[in-house]
UniProtKB/Swiss-Prot annotation:
Feature: DNA-binding region: 18-45
Biased composition (Polar residues): 299-311
GO molecular function: DNA binding; DNA-binding transcription factor activity, RNA polymerase II-specific; zinc ion binding
SUPFAM superfamilies given in the database record: Zn2/Cys6 DNA-binding domain (SSF57701)
Organism name: Gibberella zeae (strain ATCC MYA-4620 / CBS 123657 / FGSC 9075 / NRRL 31084 / PH-1) (Wheat head blight fungus)
GO biological process: aflatoxin biosynthetic process
UniProt entry tagged with the keyword Glycosyltransferase: no
Coiled coil regions in record: none
Name of the featured protein: Aurofusarin biosynthesis regulatory protein aurR1
Localisation: Nucleus
Stretches for region Disordered: 52-73, 275-314
Keywords for this protein: DNA-binding, Metal-binding, Nucleus, Transcription, Transcription regulation, Zinc
Top-level taxon in the UniProt lineage: Eukaryota
Length: 398
């Protein structure tokens, strides 16, 4: 065989636009061999031969070879070096964060100095309506099923897709309806978590120290419940796990734990000697005619042992009908409420582990990304367990 044999350098003509973009009649990113649109939608990006485009070798033209070799097609979203840097940072964070006083404020890093525009997800990564309308009509479902096996889709969706591939047609309708759900919710998860961090009406408490102004206990408990519900919705979503959702969920959970920590610093347990003093400040003063005067919320101020500035927490009175709880019963009630919410957070951490740390659900077995997810889970679990122990210590009865 001569050196000029065309088989030695087999070159074919491929179109500049991938098959999915050409079929949907949208502009292709031309980031060959993987276009950004196909990466965002989780589709197999392929280029059919065409006589009206430039030449590319077969190795660059077929992304399936990269997938077989284990190369993840997610370099457009986050490179391996950036993920490794974040993973290394969180590993050092776990070794240094022995107490809440040394806890790096991940919330401040994400939200400080950012305008509302910067908190909005990048438009380049949004799933547009024109892309959504063409999902159900995309062909080559068998190749999509190969990628579907990598991610944790519900069994109902997987069985419906299998019915389409086998030609049964039983799951065709349900597959067409449900296929848009993960793609729609992928960006909604990030937007909801960012919104939960950026809401101005939420308590501005930080795990670095004390709040700048007094906070209302009712506002803290209400905000923690709503924020925890937002994270629960994100964890139950069937979208593909990604770094952004994991980091945002970690920031939200750390903020909730910081709220509970401030409440614990301002609440005295049933064994504290200062409980009677706080009860004197918080109990309503009866009027001369025997009726309770208008209840004004009181402010409990505790000075931390390390000499830092005092933190204030507004403790509204708690009543059961005409009966008002005294200081000891009120703070015991607060402790049980916090334990109940922390129990929900414990179940949420199990969902976080299944979504991000399970070997079968981690993105294509990327080691750097797996280390990042494990570091985030360890950080949240350590802070969660420390908070649970503090609450139980407050509720101990000698």
């Amino acid at each position: 065989m001569s050196s000029t044999d065309p088989l030695l350098r087999r070159v074919e003509n491929y179109r500049e636009s991938c098959d999915n973009c050409a079929k949907s009649k949208v502009r292709c990113g031309k980031e060959q061999p993987w276009c950004q649109r196909c990466e965002r939608r989780g589709q197999v990006c392929s280029y059919s031969p065409s006589q009206r485009s430039r030449k590319r070798t077969l190795d660059a033209a077929h992304p399936e070879s990269d997938q077989r070799n284990g190369t993840p097609p997610f370099t457009a979203i986050s490179s391996a070096s950036s993920v490794a840097a974040v993973s290394t940072g969180f590993s050092s964070m776990l070794s240094q964060a022995d107490s809440w006083g040394t806890c790096p404020d991940l919330v401040e890093l994400l939200t400080s100095g950012s305008s509302s525009e910067s908190l909005t997800p990048d438009n380049n990564h949004l799933v547009w309506l024109s892309d959504m309308e063409s999902i159900a009509g995309d062909s080559n479902i068998s190749k999509s099923m190969e990628r579907m096996d990598v991610f944790p889709y519900p069994k109902s969706i997987a069985s419906s897709a299998a019915g389409v591939v086998n030609g049964s047609g039983a799951g065709a309708d349900s597959m067409g309806r449900r296929s848009t759900c993960p793609l729609q919710n992928k960006q909604h998860c990030e937007a909801d978590l960012i919104s939960a961090l950026a809401k101005p009406e939420l308590p501005s408490l930080s795990c670095w120290g004390n709040p700048k102004a007094s906070q209302n206990l009712g506002t803290i408990l209400t905000a923690s419940r709503a924020t925890l519900k937002c994270v629960t919705t994100a964890m139950s979503c069937t979208c593909t796990p990604n770094d952004n959702v994991a980091l945002l969920a970690t920031a939200v959970l750390l903020r909730i734990l910081s709220w509970y920590h401030i409440v614990l610093k301002n609440c005295n347990g049933p064994n504290d000697t200062s409980a009677a003093t706080i009860d004197d400040h918080t109990s309503p003063t009866p009027s001369n005619d025997g009726k309770d005067t208008e209840r004004s919320v009181s402010r409990d101020t505790n000075v931390s042992q390390d000499g830092s500035e005092p933190s204030s927490l507004i403790m509204p009175p708690m009543t059961i009908g005409a009966y008002e709880l005294d200081s000891e019963n009120r703070e015991r009630m607060i402790g049980h409420i916090m334990l109940s919410e922390l129990g929900k957070m414990g179940n949420l951490l199990s969902d976080f582990s299944k979504k991000f740390c399970d070997p079968q659900s981690t993105m294509l077995g990327n080691d750097n990304r797996s280390q990042l997810f494990l570091a985030l889970e360890m950080l949240i679990r350590n802070k969660h367990m420390a908070t649970v122990l503090d609450v139980r210590k407050k509720l101990e009865v000698k």
